[in-house]
Amino acid sequence: MPDEAFMPHPVVPKRAGATPHTSIIPPFPCATLRAIPYCLEFAMRRELAIEFSRVTESAALAGYKWLGRGDKNTADGAAVNAMRIMLNQVNIDGTIVIGEGEIDEAPMLYIGEKVGTGRGDAVDIAVDPIEGTRMTAMGQANALAVLAVGDKGCFLNAPDMYMEKLIVGPGAKGTIDLNLPLADNLRNVAAALGKPLSELTVTILAKPRHDAVIAEMQQLGVRVFAIPDGDVAASILTCMPDSEVDVLYGIGGAPEGVVSAAVIRALDGDMNGRLLARHDVKGDNEENRRIGEQELARCKAMGIEAGKVLRLGDMARSDNVIFSATGITKGDLLEGISRKGNIATTETLLIRGKSRTIRRIQSIHYLDRKDPEMQVLIL
């Protein structure tokens, strides 16, 4: 390229009547100019990823204030408030698609709520301000603040009901099918990973509904990790290179299932899900039947078939997602918050699906330097 290509040249500002100013940007060929909008979009999305990490950090700090105080609802409310405050500072046109409930059930972060400044990309957002409210209230491990963001229409708009989940990492992608018996799935996963069943590790929620399944897996020789709560964190571990967890199986919340689907899609793992009515999970009494019928009606209204196997692409339709999780209490995935006076440290897992970049961010927060509305929630 000739030397004059690097000489300053005039750039005309957009403002009418302004005089040209000087730029040291070289004159790009036409092909490069056509690529600039994509590059700008890419840079903007990277900046958004950091903004979303600030959202989960703030929610985690707000929840931590109520750590071990036995009040899971107050802890969750504080995290919801903090998450909403921070989301509304981000330059997005965001819609909550997985949140704290319907508009008549939740004052904030309800399904359909608009968040962000209204400027910027139109995105759908799945939130779980505290994944593990009971664990936070009791001071137990593995509580997180979680958020996933995707393109408009990316996520399944799942009702707040139960979901059967089967999740594996990239090494076993394409080998799972909830239409098959669990034992067949475990054998297929073990074969794909090149290990015997005795070396396969499955994580499952330690709930009475899983007692028979746990016994079945152990009889097969599978190693079972039964955890009290927190299947989003456990699902991520199936895809982490340094984790010994191979499979997550069990029945948990459908909203958490969609959040898991987002991060599993971002990490190139695989997942099947199946929506289940309450009376099919908790027992067929009058109250459970009443709630279950309402859930099934909601599914029908949303065009979703309960009981049908959902593939990963049904729940997260693109890998162009950003996922952020900040630890509240120490767990298998993340360190918890530590605080001394007005100084707190956090660890955040930040994942960009398009580039499949995984970052662990350790931050130090001077809490008395936060915005006044945040100080009320975290100090």
Regions found by a protein language model. Give the residues of each.
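Intrinsic disorder/low-complexity segments
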Residues: M1-L40
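N-terminal subdomain of lithium-sensitive/metallo-dependent phosphomonoesterases centered on the IMPase/IPPase/PAP
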Residues: C39-A126, R187, A191, Q218, ...
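Oxyanion/phosphate-interacting regions
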Residues: L40-E41, L48, L237-L379
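General beta-strand structural signal in soluble alpha/beta enzymes
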Residues: I96-E100, I125-V127, T136-M138, N157-A158, ...
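Short acidic, glycine/serine/threonine-rich loops at helix termini
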Residues: M108-Y110, M138-Q140, A158-M161, A212-Q218, ...
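DPxDG-like acidic metal-binding loop motif
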Residues: G120-E131, M135-C154
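Acidic beta-strand-loop-alpha-helix segment within the catalytic core
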Residues: V146, D151-A226, D319, G331-L333, ...
